[in-house]
Amino acid sequence: MFTLKKSLLILFFLGTINFSLCEEERNAEEERRDDPEERDVEVEKRFLPLLLAGLPKLLCFLFKKC
């Protein structure tokens, strides 16, 4: 139970950091844009796919069930 709480806390912490970094990046890009058509372009989130790709390995390591 403790390892589950610990891993969820780590995921929450990483998600919070990811969200704040993406928000800062999005704000910086919006300041640089001059063309109104470019404002509709979504900001690519690069950290989330990496986190999701490593999640099974992390869970396997934490719970020792592969």
From Swiss-Prot:
Signal peptide region: 1-22
BP terms from Gene Ontology: defense response to Gram-negative bacterium; defense response to Gram-positive bacterium
Propeptide stretches in the record: 23-44
Subcellular compartments: Secreted
Cysteine disulfide partners in this protein: C60-C66
Superkingdom in the source lineage: Eukaryota
Secreted keyword on record: yes
Keywords: Amphibian defense peptide, Antibiotic, Antimicrobial, Cleavage on pair of basic residues, Disulfide bond, Secreted, Signal
Gene Ontology cellular-component terms listed: extracellular region
Transcription regulation listed as a keyword: no
Summary of the tissues where the protein is detected: Expressed by the skin glands.
Function according to Swiss-Prot or TrEMBL: Antimicrobial peptide.
Similarity comment: Belongs to the frog skin active peptide (FSAP) family. Brevinin subfamily.
Name assigned to this protein: Brevinin-1CDYd
Organism in which the protein naturally occurs: Rana dybowskii (Dybovsky's frog)
